[in-house]
Amino acid sequence: MAVVKSSEIEKGSFLLIKGAPHIVLEREFSKTGRGGAIVRLKLKNLKNKFVIRETLKGADTAEAIEIYEVSAQYLYKDKDVLVFMDLETYDQVSLDLKESANLQDKVPFLQESEIYSLVTFDNVVIDIKLAPKIAFEVVEVEAAVKGDTVTNAMKNITLNTGLVVKAPLFINVGDKVLINSETKEYAERIKN
């Protein structure tokens, strides 16, 4: 781990703040007339996803850290444990959801045999990178009455992972759809 001056910190840098890994979301540098330089940072904790703000003076330093990404294939979920296979070493990686509460919101998007990037810090997986839009198959749709369409009417659909989202009335069982992984909302239907 390297020590960096506050003036060298850039957007996208990884820092160790109060013992936890953070990514710099925003950086604002201002130089006051008498007081010297100030760097205001907006940071996202990579373990619990909380966003904090820090202000550093010009002479302050921070600890830069290395974050690694490992390509892994999702194998299965066994109760509260996600099991992946590291594609480089072919070792199995088990992630206990009780110990990694921030990974809970990723579970509905994980599909068996798909490849994901596991973000690691200090040899511990702290995040699973998802694509912005993910393809799913519709396995169940809620019945909708066609006459109730004053505006764009939506209905609940259940996807192959169990995730339930709202989608337009024209979506049927067996259709493939793209879902926004950030908002958990329907994005579009995939044409065959």
Curated annotation (Swiss-Prot):
Q: Would you tell me the protein name for this molecule?
A: Elongation factor P
> Which family does this protein fall into?
Belongs to the elongation factor P family.
GO MF terms held by the record: translation elongation factor activity
Q: Which residues cross the membrane?
A: none
Cellular component terms per the entry's GO annotation: cytoplasm
| Role of this protein | Involved in peptide bond synthesis. Stimulates efficient translation and peptide-bond synthesis on native or reconstituted 70S ribosomes in vitro. Probably functions indirectly by altering the affinity of the ribosome for aminoacyl-tRNA, thus increasing their reactivity as acceptors for peptidyl transferase.
Entry-linked PANTHER family: ELONGATION FACTOR P, TRANSLATION ELONGATION FACTOR KOW-LIKE DOMAIN-CONTAINING PROTEIN
Q: Tell me, which GO biological process terms does this entry list?
A: peptide biosynthetic process
Q: In which pathway does it act?
A: Protein biosynthesis; polypeptide chain elongation
Organism, by scientific name, is: Borreliella burgdorferi (strain ATCC 35210 / DSM 4680 / CIP 102532 / B31)
List localization entries: Cytoplasm
Give the NCBIfam families listed for this entry.
Answer: efp, PRK00529.1
What InterPro entries does the record point to? Elong-fact-P_C, NA-bd_OB-fold, Rib_uL2_dom2, Transl_elong_fac_P/YeiP, Transl_elong_KOW-like, Transl_elong_P/YeiP_cen, Transl_elongation_fac_P, Translation_prot_SH3-like_sf
| UniProt xrefs under Gene3D superfamilies | 2.30.30.30, Nucleic acid-binding proteins
Kindly report the protein's main subcellular placement as a broad class: cytoplasm
Tell me which domain of life the UniProt entry assigns to the organism this sequence originates from. Answer: Bacteria
Record keywords = Cytoplasm, Elongation factor, Protein biosynthesis
